[in-house]
Amino acid sequence: MKFFIDTADVGEIKKALALGLCDGVTTNPSLVAKTGRGFEDVLKEIVQLVPGPISAEVTATDYEGMLREGRHYAKFGSQVVIKVPLTVEGLRAVKTLTDEGTKVNVTLCFSPVQALLAAKAGATYISPFVGRLDDISQDGMAMVADIVQIYRNYGFKTQVLVASVRHPVHVLEAAKLGADVATIPYSVIEQLAKHPLTDAGLKKFLADWEKVPKAPK
């Protein structure tokens, strides 16, 4: 399973790259707003850092506007993937952009049927939002399981990109279900490496090491 980092913070991207845990990047307007920077400046910098897929989200909600923004962002680098919402207008844009050779990530997916439509339209990625479904007492990972099964049933090439990841269990379940990608906040990436028994074991090893006779310097 590929790890994308869900951020527009260049510092976090650099840290994930140093760990070998950044196969790609996903951004959205909310993440960009947190940086206090203009999106195009951020996108240009990320393109210079990351060789893998970089999702750049359109803010237009109409077909023509999505095409205009998508075509513009696609010029920033061959690794740029245009991110569009799962609406009827968005699906129209997916079909057109895909036919033009542009990769598309369909976002804000909350049902397997929506994911089926995105695959039929030719999406490169589908982004089911598991955390937001969990927030309303629905099962986000059950949605992912259904999407993976549907895509396997019919041989769709659209990759399942699990989004709205809130904690390590989401990453674990995505991997068990066979999702192609999980896009993960840097804070969750750090949590993945932590375990209380690892900390306890390291503490004991270091304490025991202090008891070992040392050669004089």
From Swiss-Prot:
Pathway: Carbohydrate degradation; pentose phosphate pathway; D-glyceraldehyde 3-phosphate and beta-D-fructose 6-phosphate from D-ribose 5-phosphate and D-xylulose 5-phosphate (non-oxidative stage): step 2/3. InterPro entries: Aldolase_TIM (IPR013785), TAL/FSA (IPR001585), Transaldolase_3B (IPR022999), Transaldolase_3B/F6P_aldolase (IPR004731), Transaldolase_AS (IPR018225), TSA/FSA_arc/bac (IPR033919). GO terms for biological process: carbohydrate metabolic process; pentose-phosphate shunt. It is found in: Cytoplasm. One of its GO terms (molecular function) is aldehyde-lyase activity. Keywords: Cytoplasm, Pentose shunt, Schiff base, Transferase. The active site is at residue 83. It catalyses: D-sedoheptulose 7-phosphate + D-glyceraldehyde 3-phosphate = D-erythrose 4-phosphate + beta-D-fructose 6-phosphate. It comes from the Bacteria. Its EC number is 2.2.1.2. GO terms for cellular component: cytoplasm. Its main location: cytoplasm. It is an enzyme of class 2 (transferase). Belongs to the transaldolase family. Type 3B subfamily. Transaldolase is important for the balance of metabolites in the pentose-phosphate pathway. This is Probable transaldolase.
